[in-house]
Amino acid sequence: MPKVEIYKSILLEKIGKILTKSELVSVLEMAKAEICEFDTVNDKIKIEFNDTNRPDLWSCAGLARQIKTYLFGHLPLFKFFSMADNLQEFYGEILVSPEVFSIRPFIFGFLAKGVICNERMLETLIQLQEKLCHNYGQKRKRVAMGMYSSDLIEFPLSYTACNSDYRFIPLGMDREMSIEEINRVHSKGIEYSTILASFNKYPLLLDDKDKVLSYPPVINSHDIGALKVGDTDLFIEVTGTNLEATLLSLSVTACDLHDMGFEILPVKTIFPNETLFGKEIICPYYFQNMLEVNVDNVNKMLGSNFTANNMCLDLKKLGISAYFKELDKFYVIPPVYRNDFLHEVDVIEEIMIGMGLDSFKPELPKDFTLGRLSQIEEFSRKIKNLMIGMGFQEMIYNYLGSRTDFIEKMNIEGDDFLSVANPMTEGYEYIRGSIVSDLLKSESISSNFPYPHKIFEIGKVALKDLNSVDGTITYDNLAFLMADKEFSFNEINSLVSSLFYYLNIEFKLRESSKSLYIDGRGVDILINDTVLGGFGEVSPYILRNFGIMVPCCVLEINLNKLLN
C-alpha cells in the first residue's frame, strides 16, 4: 500500500486548524489512512493508505484538501479544468506524431506559474511524482510524469518516435548517449526500458527548437529535465498507455499545485487520431461521468433510513457534489481529481464514511447457521492434494485481465468472454474464461528458472450464458502446465491418466480441433459423451505470442461437470 512522508506543520497549515495527534489519527480514518511514524525532530509524519484507488491523497496538499473539506464542508473549486462543452483558453500545444501513437499514445500537460519553489516544495512534488508513477502508474508502464522549468522550453512541443541511435544527454550524465546505450547502461534505462521492449522505435519529447525534454517513460534530459530550488514557472507532462489514467494523474498534480498557490495554465494536445474525448484535448480535462443513485438501495445496504438530502450532505463532507430532483434518487458528480466511482456501491461507501463509521451500531446476527465445505470445495481440495503429490506447484491468479492476454494471444474469438463495462485499466477489462492464459503468462516470465516447470491452479472462470438469469455462468476449473524440452503428449497423457485413476473416474479421449494445440496433439476429455475439458501440446504460434521458447503441455477441465 502507498506510504508518504509529509511535513506536519505544512499539513496543519493547509487544513487551517491545529489538530492533536489523537484528532489527526481519528480524522485520517476517513481517508482510509493511518500514521506509521511520527518524526518530531524533522517535523515529519509517515502515513500509509489502505486504498490504492485514491492517488489524490498521496501528497500533503491532497490529504489536507480532503481533511479540510471533511471538517469544514467547503467544496474545493478548480476553474482551470476544460470540459467537452466548456473549453478553457490554452497557453501551449503538444503535437503527437502517428509513429508514437502506436507505442505510447497519450501525453498531456499544463503550465504552473507564480510560486518560488523551495526545498520542501520540491521534495513534496518529487514524492508525488514517484507515488503516481510507481503505484498508480504501475512502475511507469501505465503512467509516467516529467517536470521541467518552463523558462527553458519553446512551444509547441513535439511528441514523436525515434530510432535507437538517436543521441542526447540524459539526466544524471555529462555526455551524449544513444537510446540503445541508455537502455543498456543507464540505471533508469535498465529499470524501465523493458516497458518498450516490444517496439523498434522509442518515444521522444522535443520542444520547438528540437531540444530534448525527455525519453518517456525512461529518463528526462540533462539540460531541461530537472527542477531546482528557485524555479517559479513549471511545465508538467504525463505520458501513458491508458487515456483516463493519464488524464487523472495530470488532474491530481494540477490540483495539488493549485493548492500550493500556483496559477494553472492549460495546454492543448493534438492527436493524429480520434480518442475517446476527441482529437484535441485541452488539459487539465474533466472527463468523469455523473452517477445516478437510488435512495432505497443506499438505505437497504446501510440498514439506514436517510433521505436523499441527508446523503447529499454526507457526500459533501468528502468533497463530492450531489443533488436530487426526486425523492427516490440523486445524482453524484465526481470531483475532478477522482475516478474511482465505478458503480452505485462506490457512492454508498462514501456516504457511509461521510456519516461516520461510529454512527452505525453493531448488531449480533439473528439467525444461527452451521457452516461446512461445499461439495465442489471438498472435491477441489482433493484434486489439489493430488496435483501437489505429482510435483506441481500451485498458482493463484486474478480473475480479471486484458483482452490481449485472454483472447488475442490465445488466438480465439472470445465471443463468450465477459468484459467489464467501465474498467479502471486495460489490464482489468475482461473476466477470464480460461485459466490456461494465466499459466502461459507465468511461464513467459519464468525462463530463468531451472526446468522442468510444473504449475497448476484451481479457480473460477466465467462465460456468457443466455439461458441463465443474469446472462453468465461461473465454473470451477482445474488447469495445469508442464514446460520442458523433453515433455510431449505422452508425458501429459500419462499424468492425466494417473489423475483420473486416483479419482476413480473413467474417461474417453477424442482428437480436439482447438487452435490452442498442435494439430494431432490435442484431445478432448469425455465422460458419458460430455466434454469436460482437454489437454495437449501448445501450438508454437501461441507460445510465440507469449514469448515462450520451450515446449509446453497444458490441461484444463471443468470440475463442476466432473463432480456431477
Swiss-Prot record:
The keyword Iron-sulfur does not apply. GO terms for molecular function: ATP binding; magnesium ion binding; phenylalanine-tRNA ligase activity; RNA binding. Its main location: cytoplasm. The keyword Transmembrane helix does not apply. One of its GO terms (cellular component) is phenylalanine-tRNA ligase complex. SUPFAM superfamilies: Class II aaRS and biotin synthetases, Putative DNA-binding domain. PROSITE patterns: B5. Mg(2+) binds at residues 340, 346, 349-350. It is found in: Cytoplasm. Its EC number is 6.1.1.20. It is an enzyme of class 6 (ligase). Residues 286-362 form the B5 domain. InterPro entries: aa-tRNA-synth_II/BPL/LPL, B3/B4_tRNA-bd, DNA-bd_dom_put_sf, Phe-tRNA-ligase_IIc_bsu, Phe-tRNA-synth_IIc_bsu_arc_euk, Phe-tRNA_synthase-like_B3/B4, Phe_tRNA_ligase_beta2_arc, PheRS_beta_core. HAMAP family: Phe_tRNA_synth_beta2. This is Phenylalanine--tRNA ligase beta subunit.
